[in-house]
């Protein structure tokens, strides 16, 4: 199944019209903004988890590296720092040919659950009362599912 067909089928499963013609589609899943992106034979899902804590981010970076080891703390995804904005990102690939609408929905749901755990973890690394740059906002323009 190609990306556009998968996105249309996913929309059918959700009861909404989704368009993957531009090679990407954004969904808000349980408050987590998830981008589904065409990566050739692969489906890439990714999300911006926000800025690392300003004071001593080394502890968070250590936790990220340990979580990435054998994907034990990421549900098979990868945590990274974006070179463009310095934010923490979570990303995961899977083969398009292995997915149907039901499988894609499950894949995205599980990814969003993992992302939500990391969003909460990032908040725990911030000092009490600090307002970090919350990358997840209700005005993202993403379709809420």
Residue ranges and their predicted role:
Residues 36-51:
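A short acidic-to-branched-hydrophobic micro-motif
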Residues 122-145:
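Short, highly charged C-terminal tails/helix-capping segments
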Residues 44-47, 89, 99:
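Short small-residue beta-strand/loop micro-motif enriched in glycine and branched aliphatics
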Residues 48-87, 93:
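Short, internal acidic amphipathic alpha-helical interface segments
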Residues 1-34, 82:
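Charge-rich, low-complexity N-terminal segments
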Residues 63-64, 94-127:
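Ampiphathic alpha-helical segments that act as solvent-exposed interaction surfaces
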Residues 30-33, 41, 86-87:
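Short acidic/polar mixed-charge low-complexity motifs
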């Amino acid at each position: 199944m190609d990306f556009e067909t998968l996105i249309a089928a996913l929309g059918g499963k959700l009861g909404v019209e989704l368009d993957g013609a531009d090679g990407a589609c954004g969904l808000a899943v349980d408050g987590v903004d998830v981008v589904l992106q065409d990566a050739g034979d692969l489906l890439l899902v990714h999300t911006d988890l926000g800025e690392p804590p300003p004071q001593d981010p080394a502890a968070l970076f250590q936790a990220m590296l340990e979580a990435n080891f054998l994907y034990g703390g990421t549900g098979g995804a990868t945590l990274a720092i974006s070179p463009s904005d310095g934010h923490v990102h979570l990303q995961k690939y899977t083969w398009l040919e292995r997915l149907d609408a039901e499988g894609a929905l499950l894949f995205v749901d599980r990814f969003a659950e993992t992302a939500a755990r990391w969003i909460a973890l990032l908040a725990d690394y911030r000092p009490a009362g600090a307002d970090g740059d919350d990358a997840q906002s209700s005005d993202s323009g993403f379709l809420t599912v």
